Amino acid sequence: MENTIIFKDQADAANKLFEILPKKDLVDRKTLVICMSLESVIMVDEICKNLGLNYEMLFSECISAPNNPECTIAVVSETEEIVLNDALIRAFEISYDFVYGEAHRKYEEKILKNIYKFRKGNLIGDLRNRNVIIMDEGCESGLTALVCAKTLIKEGVKSIAYATPVIASDVALSLSSVIDTIYTVDKILHFIDVDSYYESKLDATDECILQILEDSPRYLPLQKQQKGDEE
């Protein structure tokens, strides 16, 4: 392994990423943070509490090659935006009908379920003319970041930044064509996988994540519910 930073856990990653963020600029621009995955909620919630900024979830699901669940060939977002890895699709001679069929199935079976569970069934809030920064706990292929960026562009955001503790160097370069600014603790030339850069991971079960979101003063979709409970 290269001489890279290894994070103790998501809380450690949150602290180190927070240190390099342009805090005043993000606050002055009233930036909305977009959490890209349920696994990243522990880190993102901590950063948002420290920044004093609100966050939203943007749900997406990976589409795997037939008979190879470890090989991601596409990613679909909650607006049914799709990003394809055409090179892999062609190399494995996978039909595009299969890919789009799987994308729709993932949307129906996984994404809609998550929207109901973690956002009470509501669509993502109005993002027009918002400055947003997408965050996740690590970036290996960039497909999820790319589908999130494309989704946000279609939603009419004003600017998109991306913050992640670790990212593959080549992916950071390719994402720079669609993302305004990338903030990262470490760019890694020979990227292994995200979990390799964490000593351990804090519990991120659905129940744990839901509890964090319900208790958080910064998770935008549930703020109205919290206020209603207090009244």
Predicted regions and their residues:
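PRPP-associated nucleotide enzymes
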Residues: M1-E231
